[in-house]
Amino acid sequence: IGDISYAVESKAESGGFSVVRELVGHGLGKHLHEAPEVPNFGKKGSGPKMSKGLVICIEPMINLGRKETVQSRDGWTIKTIDGKPSAHFEYAVAVDKGKADVLTTFDFVEEVLNKI
């Protein structure tokens, strides 16, 4: 898992962005949110090993400003502490023998953008 976490963090930071640390991706199974946690930051070779049959949600949250967040009064909305824009996507990935299958597609986003 640490390799994924490291990749998200290093890619974001190489572009001058920051990553949210308080919220993480997760395993997906009988319940929507299960172990293991999949942080957006980490060290290569750390964390749980992935094995065939594991399904995880990688949830990069990339910010133009600082990495710290605050929760709004509505109890749901999360904002960066400096109010700068942030983007969040969720990718569901199934681990198979020697490979990973991305289960999430964003084809609908491309379709909408092509209509503009």
Roles of regions detected by a PLM:
Residues I1-I116:
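Active-site neighborhoods and metal-handling regions in enzymes and metal-associated proteins
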